Amino acid sequence: ADIKIDKISDIIKLTDKYPYDNKVQYNIDINMLHKIREPLKKMNDMIGMENIKTTIVNQILYYLKNFHKISNKLSFDDINSDKFQSRYNRDSSYNRDYSYNRGSSYNRGSSYNRYNRSYSNFSIQNDNNDYLHTVIYGPPGTGKTEIARLIADIFSRIGILKRNYFKKVTRSDLIAGYLGQTAIKTKDVIKDCLGGVLFIDEAYALGNAEGRDSFSKECIDTICESLSYYKDDLMVIIAGYKQELDTCFFSYNKGLESRFTWSYETEKYSAKQLQQILEKKINESGWRSDFKLGHKWFEKNKDSFASFGRDMETLFMKAKICHSKRVFGLSDENKSVINDEDIENAYKMFLDNKKNETKTFNNNMYI
């Protein structure tokens, strides 16, 4: 029967229906689908993000069919071309410092060569013909970091990335205090991520709208160069608001945006989705939800939750504090069950904290 896959749930159902057996011949790579089942299940359980989930499925099918790869076999003329020798020298130098042992991380100083030196049967391992670099647009608290982590996990399991390595950085991790040191600092971070994923959260903070920051220019130019130089060895994922990324990141280098060939956009959560996120966090923490406030309560108060999922996490934390006070001295059957009173009191604490944060910020403006 023909197999149609449109959604993540279709892949999960397929692995349920066909357990992997190495003695059975399949017309699809069922073993690989089983390998990515766990991160796909986590992604499928995330609230909302239907467009992102569909795009991820399309990417997976594309890569599983190996349409991203250039020809595996090289002629003698190909091997002796300037372009190939330049790449070979680059990778040989890289592998002397960062070599890969299966089942472990990259080890400095090991003697591993990525290329078979036999000219009669010279092959390239996992040579991606496409950029892997990705941009995730969206406001804070909408799951951008979690999506990035799952992408890294999935792509390492199917062999597109050589190791399951994920490094999250911000401006302070890339930009140094003196001109000239920023490029070195940025290159060191990039080399540390080779074979895996470099995730730059709030990448717009690297630059500014005026474009006058020499440190930012140095950092972003170094990133841009590395996007091509390590095209087959690195995935860079950036995240942030679309307008700010366009103004404060992509505008620094004309060739930058075209290197990010995959893009996703996380959307603001609805009141119903905020409720689902809170209930999910409660249940996953081993607690139970018994509040009857319902959708209307979240609809009335959703404007207070500008950071969406992150604010639901904060609300749950404060609800546990309020719950602890409410059940003090009561029997065990009342414990670890969040009710309406806990949520209402937690919301008051949440608003008080926001007021204090705003007051502190305003006072600091005059220091």
Predicted features and spans:
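Canonical AAA+ ATPase core
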Residues: 149, 204-211, 220-275, 284
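Flexible beta-alpha connector loops of hexameric P-loop NTPases
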Residues: 171-181, 205-217, 264
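Conserved C-terminal "switch" segment of AAA+ ATPases
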Residues: 158-163, 244, 248-251, 257-258, ...
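Short glycine-rich substrate-engagement loop in P-loop NTPases that contacts/grips substrate
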Residues: 163-193
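Walker A/P-loop
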Residues: 77-90, 117, 121-164, 188-191
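C-terminal engagement/docking regions of AAA+ P-loop ATPases
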Residues: 326-367
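Conserved catalytic network of the ASCE P-loop NTPase/AAA+ motor domain
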Residues: 127-129, 140, 158-162, 189-199, ...
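Dynamic helix-loop-helix/coil hinge segments at AAA+ ATPase domain boundaries and subdomain interfaces
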Residues: 34-57, 64-76, 172, 176-180, ...
